[in-house]
Structure formats: structure tokens, C-alpha cells
Amino acid sequence: MSYLVPAEFVTKMVDAGESKVFMSTRDTLIRSFMAGAILALAAVFAIAITVQTGNPLIGAILFPVGFVMLYLMGFDLLTGVFMLVPLALLDKRPGVTMGGLLRNWGLVFVGNFAGALTVALMMAFVYTYGF
């Protein structure tokens, strides 16, 4: 990994925000759905470890693994999109509008929520029927 001076780092962040605005609806929903599902699974994993061991510190140490997985796989969590997309708007990138920003936020919210809800329903099914 090469070193970036702060100005180059900010430029990369603005570029990432711009690319998220122009991403297709399908790709945005898939990336955000997977992010919600992976983070929900990380929460389930942390809670299960905490309950099984009786030590909440172990669960707290293991929960960030979900965030690392999101970063490495390049998925979109709403909190990250809240930071990156407005940077492209503030930089006045061509084609980046308030409508595009709100569209992206809405799609990522729906995808994150759907992914987390899917995992919640799967966990409810598993624990209800004892699989």
C-alpha cells in the first residue's frame, strides 16, 4: 500500500463519493444489501460469543470483524455513504446533484435495512424451529 498525502487522500474520497452517485440502482442495492446482512451476522456472532462465553469483552473484540469484512469486500454501509457522497456534491463535481445524493442515500438505506431484516428473519426462523 502506497502512502498518500492528505490532499490526494481527500481527492480519492471525493472520487469514491462521485462514483457512488453514478452507480446503477441494481449494483447499489446489492452492495448495500450485502453490507446490512454482513453487519447483522457480525452482531449475531458477537452476541452468540458473549452469551456462550459469558465474557462481553470477547464479543466486543470480535464485532469489528464485520466492519473489516465490509471494507475489504467494498460494500456500502449507510454511514460511509453519508460521508463520501456529500463530498462530491460540495466539490461541485459535474452531474452530482442533491437528487442523486438523496437517491443514493435512499437506495443504500433500503438495501442495508433489507439485508439486516433478512438476517433477523433467518435467525428468528433458526431459533424458533431449533435448527
In which residue ranges do the predicted regions lie?
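Alpha-helical transmembrane segments and their helix-helix packing motifs
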Residues: 1-131
